[in-house]
């Protein structure tokens, strides 16, 4: 991790501790869902990207100072995990250089599947240890207590380092935390949707509960499905490349977010950064060290842009201004 720490000196943010574990991560990681194309249930939803391009994206993230990667069983039934492994090896990174997080898919399963599924995760990650293993969502045939006990068994067996959840409500997160506490382990994270365009966790108790319990929030979709980049505001014709569902969703969002995106552009001009970088910086800054985030990337410049969001600091006034403009979301 020394190389990463040296790179972090060029950034404006320190490494953050994942919950109450000893795992140190950059405030921005790289989400790997876009690497799912070609496999499993989610495969058809994403274009197939060549391994060469995936290698370049991961290398760009690493060179920008990012030290952790978030993948999942659901992301192509191992395609994303295996692609990440190949990319890390191509970049010359060892297990000690990076932090890898992945997830167990619980739908139509019980906690008894957890010790079996982990063997596939280990196989696909091929030598890169699982620093964080999460229950991907709350729908399951088992209780959170049963799931956490199965996860704790994996920690005891040395197969994972820490346990997290994703898309859990405040109450379900509290139950997971309590179950792990009985095993002498912390609940490290709750991975949920959060951005300037979706601040529901501030209103439904999830963020307050996470802060109370010392659980890190991992924010996914931090750019509002691309709306906060401003590209759809400048060129609405880009929507024609999207499905009917996405066009319907993004079209309404374009009008509602116009004022917010204009402010992101104005602030970005001050720092010579993009609206997306301002939006990411706000996510990792507004609540102190409570929230980290995982924007995805399919192109080198996107990974570079995400890493570059850690190279400047928004002022308190700018954070408050963006808070005010997005408070209705």
Locate predicted features.
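Acidic (Asp/Glu)-rich catalytic clusters
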Residues: 85-95, 119-127, 153-155, 177-182
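Active-site mouth loops of central-metabolism enzymes
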Residues: 38-51, 103-112, 136-142
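A short, structured active-site edge motif that brings together acidic residues
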Residues: 95-108, 132-136, 191-194
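N-terminal binding-site loop/beta-alpha segment at the start of enzyme catalytic domains
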Residues: 2-98, 156
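Beta/alpha (TIM)-barrel catalytic core signal, keyed to glycine-rich beta->alpha loops juxtaposed to Asp/Glu
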Residues: 3, 12-15, 138-329
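Active-site groove signature of glycoside hydrolases
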Residues: 125-143
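Conserved beta-strand positions in the central sheet of alpha/beta enzyme cores
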Residues: 29, 68-70, 131-134, 164, ...
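Short, acidic/polar
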Residues: 47-61, 110-125, 144, 148, ...
């Amino acid at each position: 991790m020394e190389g990463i720490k040296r790179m972090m000196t060029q950034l404006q943010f320190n490494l953050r501790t994942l919950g109450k574990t000893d795992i140190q991560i950059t405030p921005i990681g790289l989400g790997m869902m876009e690497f799912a194309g070609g496999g499993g249930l989610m495969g058809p939803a994403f274009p197939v990207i060549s391994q060469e391009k995936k290698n370049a994206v991961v290398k760009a993230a690493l060179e920008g100072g990012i030290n952790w990667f978030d993948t999942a069983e659901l992301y192509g039934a191992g395609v994303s995990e295996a692609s990440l492994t190949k990319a890390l090896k191509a970049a010359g990174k060892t297990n000690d250089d990076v932090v890898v997080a992945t997830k167990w898919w619980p739908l139509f399963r019980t906690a008894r599947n957890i010790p079996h599924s982990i063997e596939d995760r280990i196989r696909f990650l091929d030598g890169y240890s699982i620093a964080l293993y999460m229950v991907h969502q709350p729908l399951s045939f088992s209780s959170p207590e049963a799931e956490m006990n199965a996860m704790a068994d994996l920690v005891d067996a040395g197969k994972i380092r820490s346990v997290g959840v994703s898309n859990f409500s405040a109450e379900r997160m509290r139950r997971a935390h309590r179950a792990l506490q009985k095993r002498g382990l912390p609940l490290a994270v709750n991975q949920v949707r959060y951005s300037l365009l979706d601040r529901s966790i501030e209103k439904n108790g999830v963020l307050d509960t996470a802060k109370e319990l010392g659980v890190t929030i991992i924010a996914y979709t931090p750019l509002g499905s691309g709306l906060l980049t401003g590209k759809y505001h400048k060129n609405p014709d880009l929507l024609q490349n999207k499905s009917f569902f996405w066009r319907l969703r993004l079209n309404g969002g374009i009008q509602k977010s116009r004022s917010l995106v204009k402010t992101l552009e104005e602030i970005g001009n001050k720092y010579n950064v993009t609206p997306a970088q301002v939006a990411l910086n706000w996510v990792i800054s507004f609540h102190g060290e409570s929230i980290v985030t995982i924007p995805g990337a399919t192109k080198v410049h996107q990974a570079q842009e995400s890493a570059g969001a850690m190279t400047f600091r928004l002022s308190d006034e700018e954070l408050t201004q963006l808070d005010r403009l997005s408070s209705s979301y």
